[in-house]
Every structure is written in C-alpha cells, then in structure tokens.
C-alpha cells in the first residue's frame, strides 16, 4: 500500500514581509529543511485566508514542481503576532467570511495553481459546497 506523506503548517495571521509559521520561522527557511523525497504535498492550514496567497507564491519558489500545494484556511478572528494563548479559549468566527467571500479566496488560490483546497475551523459545509460547485 502506498501512503502520501504531507507537510502541514499554519501561518501567522499577520506578518510584515515574508510569511512565517506560527513558531516564527519564515516559510522559506522551514521549507528548506524538508526532504521532498519523502512527502507528496505541502499544505497551509488553519490560518486567515488573506495570508494564504503569499504563502503559496513563496512555497512555489522553493519546492520542487512535483510537490503538491494545498490550502485550507479558517474563519476565526486573526491571532495577533506573539499571542501565546491562541488555543486557551474558543475563538469567534468572522461573520463577513461568507461562503461567497471564501470562494473568492479559493479562486485566487486556484489561479496560483494550488492542487488541494478546502476549509479548516469555522469553514462549514456551505463554504465547501461553493468550492464543489466551482469545480463542476
């Protein structure tokens, strides 16, 4: 049986220059430490949809062409840089991130040629249905 090994990372919801992991490393640095012979995909998840396009373009400049890129953002309120208690309480979802608005982000990501799209925390079935309808 063949298994697909994936590398998944969350991105800081706010950054000044290059996108960073929540642990503080720039994406370029983190991706440079991956053995791409052992994975099939790099995924960015559970972060604001607004930061994903920059993460995609940054990754595309670093990873081999045969590695898939995927994105599934969340609908939570942004986590501030340096906030250490991000999971200490239930976070509110963004009311303005409607299925239609999320679909606009998905279209942007697909124009950047990502292979995998979906949704994370706060992205519901109605959001996913819009993505599925786009593919029809």
Could you tell me what each predicted segment is?
Residues 1-136:
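Domain-level signal for soluble alpha/beta catalytic cores
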């Amino acid at each position: 049986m063949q298994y697909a090994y994936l590398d998944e990372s969350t991105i800081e919801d706010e950054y000044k220059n290059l996108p960073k992991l929540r642990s503080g490393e720039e994406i370029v640095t983190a991706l440079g430490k991956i053995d791409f012979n052992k994975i099939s995909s790099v995924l960015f998840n559970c972060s604001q949809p607004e930061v994903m396009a920059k993460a995609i373009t940054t990754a595309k400049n670093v990873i081999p062409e045969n590695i898939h890129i995927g994105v599934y953002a969340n609908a939570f309120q942004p986590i501030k840089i340096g906030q250490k208690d991000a999971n200490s309480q239930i976070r509110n979802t963004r009311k303005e991130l409607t299925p239609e608005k999320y679909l606009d982000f998905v279209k942007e990501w697909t124009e950047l040629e990502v292979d995998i799209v979906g949704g994370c925390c706060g992205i519901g079935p109605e959001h996913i249905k819009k993505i599925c309808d786009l593919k029809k």
